[in-house]
């Protein structure tokens, strides 16, 4: 099923770093970047020395998953629970923040704590050249601050009621609100957690590498009105183009 047609102008994305909770905190910079014009993804590597990896990195994300290598990938064990969260419009995405721990994902004997999840419209990763209407990134860190991103792709379809509590309160300008009841992130994951795995990077500046990527094979759905509301809130589509795989291998 094709992605939704563009119905909104690509406006200049506003300043505010933090599409991933740890990137802005770790680098402490305030360089303007966005998805359109002079601040677009093609220019990120030239905006700041700290962003240089966006241009020079060899293990960048997102990617187009075409050829894969079969492997006995370990099962993902998710231990998410209802938690109080903030819903933030940081100018680049709508992000749901987890101020406290307690939500974890374990894979291959290593446990990662969920820090936040956010969305990209349209998707950043592709499957055999196919772009999806939306993608969610569940961002985790292990005890050594090593990042893992669990990605869910959304097809065009009917309204996704499981997103309603977030979509109903999402700030339409920069800012954040607290949900008035606990939110269980596991409701946004499919029952089957089969996945593709590859080494990659943050998909936003500073494009730090060393990120473990798990892209789920089972898709969710979203309707056009939900996608359009997101794009209005953020001010533009917010997907980085796919990057070369180079010597990397995608395992499934």
Curated annotation (Swiss-Prot):
Cofactor(s) for this UniProt protein: Zn(2+)
Annotated function: Reversible hydration of carbon dioxide.
Q: Which organism is it from?
A: Neisseria gonorrhoeae
Q: By what name is this protein known? A: Carbonic anhydrase
**Keyword check for Zinc:** yes
Phylogenetic placement of the source organism: Bacteria, Pseudomonadati, Pseudomonadota, Betaproteobacteria, Neisseriales
Q: Which InterPro entries match?
A: Alpha_CA_prokaryot-like (IPR041891), CA_dom (IPR001148), CA_dom_sf (IPR036398), Carbonic_anhydrase_a-class (IPR023561), Carbonic_anhydrase_a-class_CS (IPR018338)
Q: Tell me how this protein assembles.
A: Homodimer.
The EC number(s) this enzyme carries: 4.2.1.1
Q: What gene name is listed for this protein?
A: cah
Please list the reactions this protein catalyses: hydrogencarbonate + H(+) = CO2 + H2O
Q: Which domain of life is it from?
A: Bacteria
Subcellular location, principal? periplasm
């Amino acid at each position: 099923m094709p992605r939704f047609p563009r119905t909104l102008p690509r406006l200049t994305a506003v300043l505010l770093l933090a599409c991933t909770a740890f990137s802005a905190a770790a680098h402490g910079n305030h360089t303007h970047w966005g998805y359109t014009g002079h601040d677009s993804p093609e220019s990120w590597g030239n905006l700041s020395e700290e962003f240089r990896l966006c241009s020079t990195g060899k293990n960048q994300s997102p990617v187009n998953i075409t050829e894969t290598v079969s492997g006995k990938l370990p099962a993902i064990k998710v231990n998410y629970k209802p938690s109080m969260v903030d819903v933030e419009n940081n100018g680049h995405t709508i992000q749901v923040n987890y101020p406290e721990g307690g939500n974890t994902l374990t894979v291959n004997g290593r446990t990662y704590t969920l820090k936040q999840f956010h969305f990209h419209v349209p998707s950043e990763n592709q499957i055999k050249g196919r772009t999806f209407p939306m993608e969610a990134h569940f961002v985790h860190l292990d005890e050594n601050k090593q990042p893992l991103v669990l990605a869910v792709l959304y097809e065009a379809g009917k309204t996704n009621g499981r997103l309603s509590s977030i979509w109903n309160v999402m700030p339409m300008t920069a800012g954040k609100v607290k949900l008035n009841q606990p939110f269980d992130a596991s409701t946004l994951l499919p029952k089957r957690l089969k996945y593709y795995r590859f080494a990659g990077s943050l998909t936003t500046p500073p494009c730090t590498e060393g990120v473990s990527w798990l892209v789920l094979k089972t898709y969710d759905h979203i309707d056009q009105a939900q996608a359009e509301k997101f794009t209005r809130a953020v001010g533009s589509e917010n997907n980085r183009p796919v990057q070369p795989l180079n010597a990397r291998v995608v395992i499934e």
